[in-house]
């Protein structure tokens, strides 16, 4: 139910001239009395001669009233109503009532009944009179047809009255014969007795049929009871294959438990394998990064040593001729040791293994003192670090090459 439908319904009923005021609050709760009154008024407005009982006291009367209204509107006005919603007599019944009121309201609008209230009352009275005259016309036509048929039959009977009068007079004047009367009475009694006998035979047949049916019913009951007992017996007996079935079921349960355990173990091992691979990959990445870091530091140290070596060469040219190569080595050896010690500060807890060889074979003891060992917990880190440190022998070669011009300069002096 919508507010617009309820408002339109109240306005249409007011325009049609419904004597009672309909409020919008009347259909908040079921109000079958108001709905029945409105339906009866609308039906009378559509057909004044309609005879529909207005009794709605009991449930059966209300159902009959709703069905009669719906049947009348379907046959006369071709309006299909929902009896269930009408019987609810609440807001949903307003939509069904709108179907009737909208037809009457549109008819009133087409006939120019949109004037004032006084004009509406006059037109309504005229409409009521016109409806009653139409009903009187129908009744007059029916009475005229009945009068015609009855007059024709009366004329025929009056034409036969002369002959019938003579026959009636003769029958009255003729004396009654007792023998013939008794004969007719006996014949009638005999016919009645035969009919009574036939009726008794039918009753006996009915009794026999009843006995036969009772016997069949009893037989069916016995069969049913016997089948029920047989069913109970079959249900109580344990089948022969149940032992094998239970044994197979236990085996299947064990197999399933084993499968479930193995599946869980397999899943766990796969997870452990994935974790191991991930850890190995992380260690490999860490070793790779460490190697790159060591290489970068070694390159920086090499550049620094080359730069410091060039400065030392310029100082050696200015020194005196009696300065020996051993003194030069003693000056240069502390520098790479200091660089390697700086490199080891970035990697605490590890030992670097490597050699820093000089240009001359006589300085083996000094070169052995400059070796720094590096040891790691993992073999891969040791190999990578050994490979990185193997690059270090190139440094003293360059220093040796730089020291050759010094010998030539000594010879010049």
UniProtKB/Swiss-Prot annotation:
Q: Which GO terms describe its biological process?
A: axoneme assembly; cilium assembly; floor plate formation; heart looping; intraciliary anterograde transport; neural tube closure; smoothened signaling pathway
Q: Which UniProt keywords apply?
A: Cell projection, Cilium, Cilium biogenesis/degradation, Coiled coil, Nucleus, Phosphoprotein
Q: Which InterPro entries match?
A: Clusterin-associated_protein-1 (IPR019366)
Superkingdom of origin: Eukaryota
GO CC annotation terms, alphabetical: actin cytoskeleton; centrosome; ciliary base; ciliary tip; cilium; intracellular membrane-bounded organelle; intraciliary transport particle A; intraciliary transport particle B
Q: What does this protein do?
A: Required for cilia biogenesis. Appears to function within the multiple intraflagellar transport complex B (IFT-B). Key regulator of hedgehog signaling.
Where Phosphoserine occurs, residue numbers?
314, 324, 326, 409
Coiled coil start-end: 198-291
Q: Where in the cell is it found?
A: Cell projection, Cilium; Nucleus
Question: What's the protein name?
Answer: Clusterin-associated protein 1
* First-listed, main subcellular location of the protein, grouped into a coarse class: other
**Region entry Disordered: which residue ranges?**
305-413
Q: Mark out the compositionally biased spans (Acidic residues).
A: 312-328, 360-388
Summary of subunit composition and partner proteins: Interacts with CLU/clusterin. Interacts with UBXN10; the interaction is direct.
Q: Which organism is it from?
A: Homo sapiens (Human)
State the similarity comment: Belongs to the CLUAP1 family.
């Amino acid at each position: 139910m919508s507010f617009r439908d309820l408002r339109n319904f109240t306005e249409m009923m007011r325009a049609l001239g419904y004597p009672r005021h309909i409020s919008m609050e009347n259909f908040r709760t079921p109000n079958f009395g108001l709905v029945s009154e409105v339906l009866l008024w609308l039906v009378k407005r559509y057909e004044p001669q309609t005879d529909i009982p207005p009794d709605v006291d009991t449930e059966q009367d209300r159902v009959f009233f709703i069905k009669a209204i719906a049947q009348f509107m379907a046959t006369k006005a071709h309006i299909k109503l929902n009896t269930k919603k009408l019987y609810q007599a609440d807001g949903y019944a307003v939509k069904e009532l709108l179907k009737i009121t909208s037809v009457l309201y549109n008819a009133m609008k087409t006939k120019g009944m949109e004037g004032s209230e006084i004009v509406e009352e006059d037109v309504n009275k005229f409409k009521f009179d016109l409806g009653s005259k139409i009903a009187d016309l129908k009744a007059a036509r029916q009475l005229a047809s009945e009068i015609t048929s009855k007059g024709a039959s009366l004329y025929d009977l009056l034409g036969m009255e002369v002959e019938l009068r003579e026959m009636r007079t003769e029958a009255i004047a003729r004396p009654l014969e007792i023998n013939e009367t008794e004969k007719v009475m006996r014949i009638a009694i005999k016919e009645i007795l035969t009919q009574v006998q036939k009726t008794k035979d039918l009753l006996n047949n009915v009794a026999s049929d009843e006995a036969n049916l009772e016997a069949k019913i009893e037989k069916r009951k016995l069969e049913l009871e016997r089948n029920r007992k047989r069913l109970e017996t079959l249900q109580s007996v344990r089948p022969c294959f149940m032992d094998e079935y239970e044994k197979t079921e236990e085996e299947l349960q064990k197999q399933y438990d084993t499968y479930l355990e193995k599946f869980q173990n397999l899943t766990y091992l796969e997870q452990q394998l994935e974790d191991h691979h991930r850890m190995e990959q992380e260690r490999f990445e860490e070793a790779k990064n460490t190697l790159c870091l060591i290489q970068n530091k070694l390159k920086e140290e090499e550049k620094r040593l080359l730069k410091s070596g060039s400065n030392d060469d310029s100082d050696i040219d200015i020194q005196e001729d009696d300065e020996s190569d051993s003194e030069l080595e003693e000056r240069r050896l502390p520098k790479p040791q200091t660089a390697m010690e700086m490199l080891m500060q970035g990697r605490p807890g590890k030992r670097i293994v490597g050699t820093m060889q000089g240009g001359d074979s006589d300085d083996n003891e000094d070169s052995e003192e400059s070796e720094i060992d590096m040891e790691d917990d993992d073999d891969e880190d040791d190999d990578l670090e050994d490979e990185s440190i193997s690059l270090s022998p190139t440094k003293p070669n360059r220093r040796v090459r730089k020291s050759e011009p010094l010998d030539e300069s000594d010879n010049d002096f």
